[in-house]
Design a protein with these regions (language model features):
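Aromatic-enriched hydrophobic runs in primary sequence
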Residues: 24, 46, 55, 61, ...
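Residue-level marker of positions within ordered structural domains that often coincide
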Residues: 51, 103, 137
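Short beta-strand edge/turn micro-motifs at domain boundaries
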Residues: 1-11, 93-97, 107-150
């Protein structure tokens, strides 16, 4: 069973304030990287940042986009906030849920460059909740994206 920890207790149970800040810096970098690479259809550069389930979901979405001849245009403007919402621990596995608020310009076009959705001239505020996981026994300090919600 997972042990749930309130956000205020997170720093005391897992790591100190400095490590928490470092985690959020890394989470922000991962968030931007994953969004931009997925939008470009390139999973090679993010394979080490996402678990197999997420990789398979992203790969399927990219395949479907290509089959339909759809093109995405995404410009990542920035992250307004990234807040740790929940921490769970089971045995040696840590899971951290982060709520991101970002600004992105995006649109989806068909083969003829007609806009199907989005607006290439408008900044959109995006709310995402992502869950990251890490095995504390691992010598690899990286966290994996294991779930996304928006």
């Amino acid at each position: 069973m997972f042990k749930k920890t309130r956000t205020k207790d997170f720093k005391n149970e897992v790591f100190g304030e400095e490590a928490k800040k470092d985690f959020l810096i890394g989470a922000k970098i991962a968030y931007e990287t994953i969004i931009t690479e997925f939008a470009s259809g390139n999973l090679k550069n993010i394979k080490s940042l996402i678990d197999k389930k997420i990789y398979d979901q992203f790969n399927q979405a990219i395949r479907e986009r290509k089959e339909k001849g759809h093109l995405t245009e995404t410009n990542f403007v920035g992250i307004n906030s990234a807040v740790i919402k929940e921490h769970e621990k089971k045995d040696n596995i840590l899971e951290v849920t982060v709520e991101f608020v970002s600004e992105i310009i995006s649109c989806l076009r068909d083969r003829n460059k007609k806009i199907l959705s989005g607006d290439p001239g408008k900044i959109k505020k995006v709310h995402d909740t992502w869950k990251f996981s890490r095995d504390v026994r691992s010598t690899n300090p990286s966290w994996l994206l294991i779930d996304t919600q928006n």
